[in-house]
């Protein structure tokens, strides 16, 4: 347990940050999974809608500091390639 006020505050901040990161990590996995599943089912319309949501969500994570800009661009790009491969 923390013995100093500043250490107690840092411990509280760590808990908050961990919960926030867990939320974004889970959300990122779920939106990516939705796009991949729609692409696997060859459902072009559903995949395009899921990609649109994923694009918006991923870039929102960049503005909140959860992802770096290059990482977000790479993820969106790979998902877009997957959706564009659907005949």
Curated annotation (Swiss-Prot):
GO terms for cellular component: cytosol; small ribosomal subunit. Keywords: Ribonucleoprotein, Ribosomal protein, RNA-binding, rRNA-binding. GO terms for biological process: translation. Residues 1-20 are annotated as: Disordered. It holds the Pfam family Ribosomal_S20p. SUPFAM superfamilies: Ribosomal protein S20. It comes from the Bacteria. GO terms for molecular function: small ribosomal subunit rRNA binding; structural constituent of ribosome. Binds directly to 16S ribosomal RNA. Belongs to the bacterial ribosomal protein bS20 family. This is Small ribosomal subunit protein bS20. It comes from Campylobacter lari (strain RM2100 / D67 / ATCC BAA-1060). The gene is rpsT.
């Amino acid at each position: 347990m923390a013995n100093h006020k500043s250490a107690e505050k840092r411990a509280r901040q760590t808990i908050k940050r961990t919960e926030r990161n867990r939320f974004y990590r889970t959300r990122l996995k779920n939106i990516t999974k939705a796009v991949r599943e729609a692409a696997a089912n060859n459902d072009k319309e559903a995949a395009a809608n899921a990609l649109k949501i994923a694009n918006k969500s991923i870039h929102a994570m960049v503005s909140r500091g959860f992802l770096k800009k290059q990482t977000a661009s790479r993820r969106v790009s790979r998902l877009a390639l997957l959706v564009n491969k659907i005949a």
